[in-house]
């Protein structure tokens, strides 16, 4: 799993299987609470376009537009219970994206780590792979189904289990990995590429250390890019040089 580039056939179609990790905060549009249908529809259109081009797309969505377990813990809530609230929030995002993907004519299945049979399938890895092989999008909801695990870690684990080529992390309002927060430091420097070890030792805010370590131990490349810039999902899938690549070598060569 060393390349992030989808293969392209003579007819211009792309192939390859990718895990797309979407920021839950982006679903609210302006960083507030809830779901902005216009934003979700725009994301769905971009995903539908790459699926029609032949890519196999699995998705994990955060729940930051509803709840963040770690933040609720700081405010006095039990961490495990607040994490479960966050997991349920991700399912609402999954259903919203599923609806708009199907409006775009793309078959879509939601699989959840917490069983909720009336709205989604249970998480069954082999079934997820069969869906992908049939051209369906699979959205994984409810995180890992256990507290203390982030949706970034979920995305890394699911990507490995379905044998994805790369983990594509669509961020809200930031176009890659920087040496400091570009929202507060105008002199922040963006990285073109990084090694896994450097991300961990410098505590760069790509994903939590568990997720990055999983990717490092299994040589799963990560591409961090701005989610809401038009065309970026397709660029990431096609292997164009956008955002920041995190991999074994720390370069794009």
UniProtKB/Swiss-Prot annotation:
GO MF annotation terms: ATP binding; UMP kinase activity
Pathway: Pyrimidine metabolism; CTP biosynthesis via de novo pathway; UDP from UMP (UMPK route): step 1/1
Catalytic activity from the UniProt record: UMP + ATP = UDP + ADP
Cellular localisation: Cytoplasm
Regulation: Allosterically activated by GTP. Inhibited by UTP.
Superkingdom, natural source: Bacteria
A single Gene Ontology CC term: cytoplasm
Family: Belongs to the UMP kinase family.
Subunit: Homohexamer.
Protein name: Uridylate kinase
Source organism: Streptomyces coelicolor (strain ATCC BAA-471 / A3(2) / M145)
């Amino acid at each position: 799993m060393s390349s992030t580039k989808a293969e392209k056939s003579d007819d211009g179609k792309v192939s390859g299987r990718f895990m797309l990790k979407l920021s839950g905060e982006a679903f609210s549009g302006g960083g507030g609470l809830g779901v902005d249908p216009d934003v979700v529809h725009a994301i769905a259109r971009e995903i539908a376009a790459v699926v029609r081009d032949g890519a196999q797309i699995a998705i994990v969505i955060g729940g930051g537009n509803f709840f963040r377990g770690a933040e609720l813990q700081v405010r006095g809530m039990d961490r495990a219970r607040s994490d479960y609230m966050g997991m349920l929030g991700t399912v609402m995002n999954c259903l919203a994206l599923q609806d708009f993907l199907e409006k775009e004519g793309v078959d879509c299945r939601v699989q959840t780590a917490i069983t909720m049979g009336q709205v989604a399938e249970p998480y069954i890895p082999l079934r997820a792979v069969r869906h992908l092989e049939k051209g369906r999008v699979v959205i994984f909801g409810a995180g890992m189904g256990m507290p203390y695990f982030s949706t970034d870690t979920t995305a890394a684990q699911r990507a490995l289990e379905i044998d994805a080529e790369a983990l594509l992390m669509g961020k809200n309002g930031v176009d890659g990995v920087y040496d400091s927060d570009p929202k507060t430091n105008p002199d922040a420097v963006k990285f073109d590429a990084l090694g896994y070890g450097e991300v961990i030792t410098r505590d760069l805010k790509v994903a939590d250390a568990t997720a990055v370590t999983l990717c490092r131990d299994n040589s799963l490349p990560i591409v961090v890019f701005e989610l809401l810039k038009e065309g970026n999902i397709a660029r990431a899938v096609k292997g164009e040089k956008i955002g920041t690549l995190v991999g074994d070598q720390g370069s794009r060569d």
